[in-house]
């Protein structure tokens, strides 16, 4: 972990700036989302979308994907070098939905990437505005986290599917930078490292030569990012051991899986940010609001206020429940896929139900789905209260790391205790002697055994009325502790497959 002096709030990572004070951070984050909004408005003009079509979340996602694809240098280079992929390396596009005679029709559009880049830069004062691109990536990642389960990916890397609460950001692209690294869960980092080690085991040249040197640097950097997410000395010491290994192999994989399991109780620091679809920023910019002047924060009241005042729509399939579709998008907007459902329900003011009980599939409509039967509905994205987003993992002050329910990685900084089945978690540690037994392992297991489920996390932290923008009067909710609060609990969500 870098020394305290170089730690920046994660909103700064988002804007790529040097150290800034709170006002400067608010201004640069405001500049970033304002740029996204201006770009979106311009794209709606280019595509001749009317007001209703511009507020359709599916159109927003297509436009977001186009700009991300236009700036994806590595993929663009790959497409140019492999012309037989059947894709035009210079073009990008996707489905745009329009309303004609009361029916929704799908139109596939194609644009020059160069043209999209020009529009994006023009909306961002001539700059590349990579922070804005990363912001869109995180919104897509949060949407995937709320929509899909990663059971298959977990099993493939030898991890337990019950560790899904550690998988935030698992679909973020490699190029998502510091802001992307901040929101990745422990399991996501572990999975990336395991994939890398497995390649090294199967491919003798992976760590060798000039390329191998770069690979090694990437490996150590990822180890350091993961180490920085752990909050106990023993977990960090184990990460040093994994990083310094001369020839990473099965022992390291076992150590990493052990660490991932330990994170179910001794939770890591994972940042949460409310990243909204581009159309929301577009609407607010169009209404004359000046984001840069007013300032903006991804972790405060601002995103809640935006959602209170924006009406956006979604296409809906015949047997889907509009309220459930709204819940899915609400969770994605607040990065709350791994939050305790009781906390989310309290903040939202409507019951938030587990994924398995939702009658809704993903937001995007596949190209082979029949548009005849597809309708549209308003998404209900408003909330009753707001709360500060956390990056701490909710560990109590008494011990550096506290009890964590299997399947919760808190999003909101709100007082609660985190019930968990210690037996379930500890059972995962038996009969695994492949990794090194060490003082660190013993110490980690001891800390886990001593963790008390009734310890209160985020002491005194509460939710706030939407009118309480300065967060002066915290309302500390009391929760019914008998109910299990995890979203993917007993689940049948679709798998995410790239």
Curated annotation (Swiss-Prot):
Residues 1-22 are annotated as: Disordered. Its main location: virion. A motif (Bipartite nuclear localization signal) lies at residues 198-216. Keywords: Capsid protein, Helical capsid protein, Host nucleus, Host-virus interaction, Ribonucleoprotein, RNA-binding, Viral nucleoprotein, Viral penetration into host nucleus, Virion, Virus entry into host cell. The keyword Ribonucleoprotein applies. GO terms for molecular function: RNA binding; structural molecule activity. Late in virus-infected cells, may be cleaved from a 56-kDa protein to a 53-kDa protein by a cellular caspase. This cleavage might be a marker for the onset of apoptosis in infected cells or have a specific function in virus host interaction. GO terms for cellular component: helical viral capsid; host cell; host cell nucleus; ribonucleoprotein complex; viral nucleocapsid. Homomultimerizes to form the nucleocapsid. May bind host exportin-1/XPO1. Binds to viral genomic RNA. Protein-RNA contacts are mediated by a combination of electrostatic interactions between positively charged residues and the phosphate backbone and planar interactions between aromatic side chains and bases. HAMAP family: INFV_NCAP. Belongs to the influenza viruses nucleoprotein family. Encapsidates the negative strand viral RNA, protecting it from nucleases. The encapsidated genomic RNA is termed the ribonucleoprotein (RNP) and serves as template for transcription and replication. The RNP needs to be localized in the host nucleus to start an infectious cycle, but is too large to diffuse through the nuclear pore complex. NP comprises at least 2 nuclear localization signals that are responsible for the active RNP import into the nucleus through cellular importin alpha/beta pathway. This is Nucleoprotein. The gene is NP.
């Amino acid at each position: 972990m870098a020394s305290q002096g170089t730690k920046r709030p994660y909103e700064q990572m988002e804007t790529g700036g040097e150290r800034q004070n709170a006002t400067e951070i608010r201004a640069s984050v405001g500049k970033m989302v304002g740029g996204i909004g201006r770009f979106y408005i311009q794209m709606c003009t280019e595509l001749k979308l009317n007001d209703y079509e511009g507020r359709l979340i599916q159109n927003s996602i297509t436009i977001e994907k186009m700009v991300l694809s236009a700036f994806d240098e590595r993929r663009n280079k790959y497409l140019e070098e492999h012309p037989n992929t059947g894709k035009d390396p210079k073009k990008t596009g996707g489905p745009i939905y329009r309303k004609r005679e009361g029916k929704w029709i799908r139109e596939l559009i194609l644009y020059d990437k160069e043209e999209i880049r020009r529009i994006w830069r023009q909306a961002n004062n001539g700059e590349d505005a990579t922070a804005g691109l990363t912001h869109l990536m995180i919104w897509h990642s949060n949407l995937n986290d709320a929509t899909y389960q990663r059971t298959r990916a977990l099993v493939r890397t030898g991890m337990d599917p019950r560790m899904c609460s550690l998988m935030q950001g698992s679909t973020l692209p490699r190029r998502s930078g510091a802001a992307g690294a901040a929101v990745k869960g422990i399991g996501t980092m572990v999975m990336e490292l395991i994939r890398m080690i497995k390649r090294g085991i199967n491919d003798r040249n992976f760590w060798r030569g000039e390329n191998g040197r770069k690979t090694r640097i990437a490996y150590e950097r990822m180890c350091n990012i993961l180490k920085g997410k752990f909050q106990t000395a023993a977990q960090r010491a184990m990460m040093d051991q994994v990083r310094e290994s001369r020839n990473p192999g099965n022992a390291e994989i076992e150590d990493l899986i052990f660490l991932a399991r330990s994170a179910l109780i001794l939770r890591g620091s994972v940042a949460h940010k409310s990243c909204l679809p581009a159309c929301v920023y577009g609407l607010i910019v169009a209404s004359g609001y000046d984001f840069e002047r007013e300032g903006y924060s991804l972790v405060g009241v601002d995103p809640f206020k935006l959602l209170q005042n924006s009406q956006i729509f979604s296409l809906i399939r015949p047997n889907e429940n509009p309220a459930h579709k709204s819940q899915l998008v609400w969770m994605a907007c607040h990065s709350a896929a791994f939050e305790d459902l009781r906390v989310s329900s309290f903040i939202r003011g409507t019951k938030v139900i587990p994924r398995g009980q939702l009658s809704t599939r993903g937001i995007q409509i596949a190209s082979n789905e029949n548009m005849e039967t597809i309708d549209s509905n308003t998404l209900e994205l408003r909330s009753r209260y707001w709360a500060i987003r956390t990056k701490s993992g909710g560990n109590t002050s008494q011990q550096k790391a506290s009890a964590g329910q299997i399947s919760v990685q808190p999003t909101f900084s709100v007082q609660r205790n985190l019930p968990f089945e210690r037996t379930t978690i500890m059972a995962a540690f038996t009969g695994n002697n492949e990794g090194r037994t060490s003082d660190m392992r013993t110490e980690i297991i001891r800390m886990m055994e001593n963790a008390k489920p009734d310890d209160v996390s985020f002491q005194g932290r509460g939710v706030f009325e939407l009118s309480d923008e300065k967060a002066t009067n915290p309302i500390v909710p009391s929760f019914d502790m008998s109910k299990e609060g995890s979203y993917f609990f007993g689940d049948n969500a679709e798998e995410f497959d790239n």
